[in-house]
Amino acid sequence: TLDTSNPQLMGIARYFNNKVTSATGFEIPVEKHGNIEFKLTDDTALSAEGYRLQVKHGDIIITAHQPAGIFYGVQTLLQMLPPEIKSSREQKGIDWTIPCADITDKPQFAWRGLMLDVSRHWFTKEEVKKYIDELAEYKMNVFHWHLTDDQGWRLEIKSLPRLTEVGAWRAPRVGQWWQREPQQSGEETTYGGFYTQEDVKEVLAYAAERYVRVIPEIDVPGHSLAALVAYPDLACMKAPSAVGVGNKFYGEDENTLCVGKDATFEFMDKVLTEVAALFPDEYVHIGGDECFKGFWHKCPRCQARMKAENLKNEEELQSYFIHRMGDLLKSKGKKLVGW
């Protein structure tokens, strides 16, 4: 039972049906009067994501102030079923019963997230969706998508095609990263992949149906080796010739954008323009961690920038860069978040 004119409740009903049909073989019709009721209330005591789940003899009622609460109530309901409910095939001989209960629940924290690093190890679009399913099952509501790093640039930027033509691919390696053989001369870069902007839109829609926000991370100014391989003019000294396989230690290969070059800020403007247009969330994560400043210390352009901006040291140069990224994102209607 639900308001069939509410598209969000209808979406949750379809989600619930998809979760139970494979294992049980039951087809549960969506009707105006049924034994499972999704009910929205004006009572704000449950908060935006809280719910009340009542399991009675022959009836199940989930009450919430917002559709997100109904969705989380469904997660609890699914967890009360026998574990065979997770099967993708019909399970015979299972007693599909739920114990009677009266549960009132709401989250303690508004931001409940997990990160997935798709740079060091490539995950396909379908694998990302499975990860989002796991977040939703545990009532997580933020997916932090670590899209770029030294070992691969995973997001299509249409104005900068080499980021994915070159930066998304490396030599195939497995094992402990510090024990990996470096890429050999002439070796093909066959490991990797990237998400087209259409792929991202599909993932965003999938996440929204599960009440999961998606926060993209573009890790700069450090952790930028893959970007420097694609666009070597953005390096302070000499950009690496190949995307990292993970065999180098911090500071060995140049992996930091040159903050002394105006071209770096033009590059970031192009990247963040497309990121801001693609991702609907108010936040964009720019990393900012583990920025090796030894390259800046030796770079005449970075030293000139420090002098021109009256910056005392390379730490202040990084702060200068971060502030410029914040202003850039603000101009695009976004807020900066970082490590």
Where do the protein language model's features map onto the residues?
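Contiguous, structured surface segment used for ligand recognition
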Residues: T1-F109
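Conserved, mostly hydrophobic/aromatic
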Residues: Q66, L114, L135, V214, ...
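Aromatic- and acidic-residue-enriched carbohydrate-binding clefts of CAZyme catalytic domains
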Residues: P107, Q151-E209, S224-E266, G294-S319
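Hydrophobic faces of well-ordered beta-strands that scaffold small-molecule active sites
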Residues: R112-L116, F143-W145, V214-I218, V284-I286, ...
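Active-site mouth loops of central-metabolism enzymes
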Residues: G113-E127, T256-A263
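A conserved hydrophobic secondary-structure block that centers on an alpha-helix together
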Residues: D117-D150
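Active-site beta-loop-alpha junctions enriched in small/polar residues
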Residues: S119, T148-G152, D219-H223, D289-C291
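Gly/Pro-rich turn-and-neighbor structural signature
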Residues: F265-W339
